Amino acid sequence: MLNQIILVGRLTRDISVHKGENGKVATLSLAIPRSFKNSEGSYDTDFIDCVAFDAVAENTSELCGKGDVVGIKGRVQSKTIEKEDKKEYGLEIICEKVTFLSSKPKEEE
């Protein structure tokens, strides 16, 4: 069996690391334009949340920031959230490796 995902996109915000139950945790949000145009002739963008832990979380928060392009290698993991005595199921992307690819574009002066 294989559970592997590779994403390349632009970080939508700076990354902050916080202490979780089992170590350090960071949530990253990637903006990834689709490879095809919609009915209006423009490209839609998907926003994908990812989670990094411990050293990956620390290194990513120190080296990458909002607007930077990164590559993520990871896996998809199911999760269960209990809200008001009701279970909700979802998926999350777990970052196993984050690679800095390029900086955000410089604003024109």
Could you say what each language-model-derived stretch is?
Residues 1-109:
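Single-stranded nucleic acid-binding surfaces, predominantly the OB-fold ssDNA-binding core
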